[in-house]
Amino acid sequence: APFLADTRVRFLEIPPEQARRGKGHVLNAGYTAVTRSELAEPNPENVVVVVFDADTRVEPHFLRAVAPYFRDPTVAGVQSAVRMYNADQKLLTLWQHLEFAVWGQVFCKAKDRLGSMTLGGNGQCVRFSALSSLGDEPWQTSSLTEDLDLSLRLLSKGWRLRFCSSVAVWQEAVPRLGALVRQRSRWLQGHVICWQHLPALLRSRLPVFARLELLLFLLLPIVFLPIGLTSIANWLHVLFSLFVGDWNYWNYDGDWDYWNTVSLLTWYVLGFGMAPLVVVAWQQIDRPPLWRLLLHSHFFVLYSFVWFAASARVYLQVLLGRHAWFKTSRREREGAGAGGVKTKRAAAALRRRRHVDQEPIQ
């Protein structure tokens, strides 16, 4: 690769038998290499480790955007926003783009304010001294979600984590439904494994609302399935009412009254509760046409069934005692690599950000 010709770049090669042991092993190998070099001397608190996936496209001003957060010595890490550069490939990849838009623009901003922000696996920036406070191998190799595990241990030790919404990393959305469900079930199972950190989190000095949010966040695997079953029952009831002619669902007797309105609003919240959040988040990052915004924000409800299926798979995996790790395949066809996939959305977003000063950070 051309960038390897830069004298500032150091290439670390890991034997295949070690690289296939999981992302945590690879990250720890990189951490060890930095520890043994002069890079972390003499001020490790001023050294920041940045983690990108292999298929990531990084916006030019990434470092300039995240660096100011580290002026606060209590900040251990910063997470950037995440976008999908193949969102235009199919409906499934667009929904993942919307999913990460809502996660970043709504939930991560809220978590940042509460003090319960957690790091992701891509676009993750961590202070070297914070990693050192976790021991010789900061990333847990036994965890299915090493990023979440790292975040919870840092928060338990009193470190702060922040979210930077002004810059994003662009990654490839998973184009196949089966691979996507497997990936999401691995994430949820990783949440279950991270329950081991709950006692330390609840005893920590984190704000009360931060601890409560983290508790609810970690319990997501067990609530997705009941919520999914409730949602399915709600939709079946509505469809039965519409096609069979049983309008009792709306309590409709010829005159529209207060309770008819309550029934309609209840159905909308249960069926399309995420739609307003999608509208807000998508409008902020892409500004799509109004018709597309309203249409896809409501069709996005179908994407929730990916999480319901993933939750059911986690129940099964836990009952069977399985904790296997599988690398998620994002390739739908040979040759559709990260460098070969270009979309109007990713290109337009990168063009909008070209005006940012790109001088190196000292």
Where are these regions (language model features)?
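Membrane-embedded multi-pass helical conduit in multi-pass membrane proteins
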Residues: 216-320
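Long helical/loop segments within the catalytic core of UDP-sugar-dependent glycosyltransferases
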Residues: 4-44, 61-144, 185-196
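Catalytic core of nucleotide-sugar-dependent glycosyltransferases
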Residues: 99-105, 181-201, 271-278, 313-315
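Catalytic donor-sugar/metal-binding loop of nucleotide-sugar-dependent glycosyltransferases
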Residues: 151-169
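The conserved acidic donor/metal-binding loop of glycosyltransferases
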Residues: 53-57, 154
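Short acidic donor-binding/metal-coordinating loop in glycosyltransferase active sites
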Residues: 46, 54, 146
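Short aromatic/hydrophobic "clamp" motif used to bind/position activated sugar donors
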Residues: 49
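Active-site donor/metal-binding and catalytic loop motifs
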Residues: 165-179
